[in-house]
Amino acid sequence: MISYDLDKMLYTIPADKHSTEEIREILGKHPEIKFVSLVGIDVGGHDTDEKIPVEEFLKDMDKFLTHGVQTDGSSVVLPKIAKLNNAKVDIIPDKTVNWFVDHNFNYPDPDTGLPVGTLRIPSSLVHNDSERVGSRVILRDAIRNFKDDLMELLR
């Protein structure tokens, strides 16, 4: 079994460390992180992601963090929202939550000896540049409705 120095590994990037300078510095200190993945969860609970090599992400980080990436929506389950003829879906990163690293312990990075990692960024799905869709929106709305209903009951 391969053993790794767990103290040298990156596990999360907290929400308060998402400036471009901080991200660049953190990823620069962790060359074992080879990919950045913007991950959205559809209403069926399936994750849809776009995996970007770190070098490409760093070159155009502002664009990726602001506008995300576009997918054709073919693998996204959005019943009664997206159809094959209008399935354009943008995956927009959420800078208000912690990001985490998914390590592949089967593939050590030859330079660091640490497992190759993918920075996974929770993201929203936006259909046709108009509305946020997917499980993150359902959860957000459920929390808001619960709070509103509870406050109404307490009044």
Language-model features: where?
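ATP/Mg2+-dependent ligation/transfer catalytic cores
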Residues: 1-155
